[in-house]
Amino acid sequence: DIMLAGAVSGSDPMFVNMGFSIFQAYPENNIHAPFDKNSQGLFAGEGAGMMVLKRHSDAVRDGDKIHAIIKGGALSNDGKGEFVLSPNTKGQVLVYERAYADADVDPRDVDYIECHATGTPKGDKVELGSMETFFSRYNNKPLLGSVKSNLGHLLTAAGMPGMTKAIWALNEGKIPATINLNDPIVSKQDYLGAEQMLTDTVDWPSSNLNKPKTAGVSVFGFGGSNAHLVLQAPSQKLETDFSTAKAREPLAIIGMDAHFGRADNLASVQQLFNQNENTFTELPKLRWRGIENNTKVMNALALNKAPKGSYVESFDIDFLRFKVPPNEQDCLIPQQLMMMKVADNAAKDAGLKEGSNVAVLVAMGIELELHQYRGRVNLSTQIEESLLQQGVKLTQEQRQTLTNIAKDSVAFAAQLNQYTSFIGNIMASRISALWDFSGPAITLSAEENSVYRCAELAENLFQTSDIDAVIIAAVDLAGSVENITLRQHYGKVNIDASPASSLLDENTWRVGEGAAAFVVKPQSKVEEQQVYATINGISFASGTDQHVTSNATASAIKKAANNALAIAGVNAESITCVEAHGSGFLHENAAEQQALPALYSGKPISSVKSNVGHLFNASGVASIVKAALMLDAKSNAKPSYVAINGLGRDESCAHLILSSSQQRHQTAAAPIVKKRPQLIKTINLGGNSITDLIIQKGQIAELTDIKKAFSSQTLVEVSHPITLKNIQPKAVAQHNVPLSNTTAVIGAQVKNNQQGLVKGVSSAKTSTDVSTKTSKEIYQASATHQAFLTTRQTAQQQISQ
């Protein structure tokens, strides 16, 4: 009945500025002005926004203040293009077509477009050309603007300021200026140009008073991910003719692939499950880069040794197939490469066709090894401060040599392809580009329930659009030292990967990592022999309250399970077996122990984590793959059912009901294509020991004089050593505290200052005065520009080293 929809952008400025410097997206001439000929790039911004959404009829009924009406919208992907950072007219025009068809709005009636327009020369020209191509068909020249001229590029929240500006304009009947626009660009055929670009605030066009004011808002993301929203002015008049969403259908799983630990393909994964084996091994030699031998770090982690786990040591990939450079120092990170491999194989298994309207949904979390780059950058100041405290005097060249040895031993200097692969949403777009898919490409992060949320989103896409299929992929290389450092705060890791006497009695978690993908279509669109299993019902429930306990979570499990069973149209007695979350975290296991046996009395309960460990963001896909393979083996006239339970760090519960089909799955016949060349290389996770690399480089001649400078000094403990306190795991007794009841302080701390807050609120204006002059419309302090420039220059200096 009501929904909160919001966005936030507040990433570490060091990573943001480093990234855009590598992408050469910052203006060399320090001019950032969307749609201006002299603009050479963008400025990054930060911020957040939130909107409350209701059905139009409900809002009118309840007497709510309506700010605007969302008539419709659409998503698309560029598919095959030049490069993941380069926009493509094909995908942008397609999203306009889909959006106005979805909104049932005539493009002739569009008054204003709030553009994506970032200020980058190529991006602005491509977007202007896309609008020319689309709107010239309808002989319409809408007014154009970009809020990025005021606020910069808010990255993950880029659409929120644009929507806010468009909604404000619809309400006020005035369109704000795009500031700093002095020399406007024009579209290729001169259809759109200066006349449409507002340099002053103007009244809303009044060419047709009988039609509602209409605006479009565009957002175009890295990787060719496109979105367009159609907004109209608030109205109390209700629509009498509108389409309804298609009826929900069960989702048939028609293609799969997986790589968990040493089980590197679907056949080996199936054998693993059939024989009830596991993939637990000792830590591979290169995985932690020798950190497991650092006593201080291991003591801080409360580990006497690296835990056994389902580690991925290496995997092979065809670089020519995926069109990525095989440069060791500028290669995509393993997280993206592994996801691409399993998603590609799943698409082949399903027999998908290139160029189809297929959506790609990827469940993932940030690759925590990214922090190695922060460590690399921090070494510059850490070494400088240490030398100063020790009284060691080195020449500038010697300091640089010493610093470079330390930095290169941690990580190579960031380069374009590698740094690009840390951007999560590009992960899905790479598959769309490989297969030339035009459907939405979305990454979704909801921790352990990420895959289940992808399945829910797939249901929604099938009901509200005309997509042909959805690829759902997930990856989590959760065996890195960074991941284990983080997750030790939630619960104790199982050092020996040893099982407890009972699954739900376990109080430690096993390390697991890997990736998997599956393809779904509506059940009515597939033949029986194509199907591994069918997702008949999916439901979510939240166990979060003021004091989360296993009882609250158990109640959420029961609620989600009963809803899922009702959606699937079966009862609990029909369930053959239960796939539990079985994480090894205390309160999660306690909740399942309380709820699942009561729900499914006498049914066998197991968890894939006994075979492959806890894959966190990819844990859901492991459960689905296991259940689908088991159900495929049980294919017969009478269906078998499996219930899957999932629990997330946000205390939400997911519950799925899967069923078997009447026939065993048959892999789609491979199309006959011309044999192409291959370039298969092995990707090793981890690398050489950091300490060993430093020692090896310590033998070079340039260090002789540096060593003498140290040997002549009596070295003392540095006054501000790097602290290891923050990585120390909490006591086990504290591990049942959910994320929702904890507060993380990152960067600057927020002080409680009620007096200042009240003063700030009382002095704030409750309305905005609109002036016709740009200088009075929006003020952007020169100090803000200077801050951007200073940060950018600092980042450029750091990455050049």
Model-derived segments and their meaning:
Residues 1-678, 682-685:
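Condensing-enzyme catalytic core of the thiolase-fold
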Residues 199, 217, 230-231, 253-254, ...:
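Flexible, low-complexity linker/boundary loops enriched in proline and small hydrophobic residues
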